[in-house]
Amino acid sequence: VEKEALNAADRAMVAQVINKRIELNMNLGMDVTSYYGVQKDMKESLTVVDLNDNNPYNTRVATFLGLPVGPICNPSLESIEAVLNPADTDYIYFYADIITGNVYFTDDYNEFLEFERLYG
């Protein structure tokens, strides 16, 4: 949650997406955990090898379900509060624009792909 969103409202929504994806038995597919797992800076691009790396933090691997084995950073109080009080939405996808800090949420995979195309 901490690394995916910059403000409290977005953090609560990211927390909700994580909860919903776990509830639906979907992989989390979060880039931030994948970067941590392969020890790359987020300014670098993840390669196909990185995305397929079978490390315990790579939530992009399709067969990886649930949370990583441990935290990827120290959470702020805002992130802890967001996890304890997630937003009430049905979103299951989000795209975080690391340049602007904007986070785009949707419950539609095609719309998520459009966010990725527009802001990625």
Over which residues does each language-model region extend?
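Bacterial extracytoplasmic/cell-wall-associated proteins, especially those involved in peptidoglycan
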Residues: V1-G120
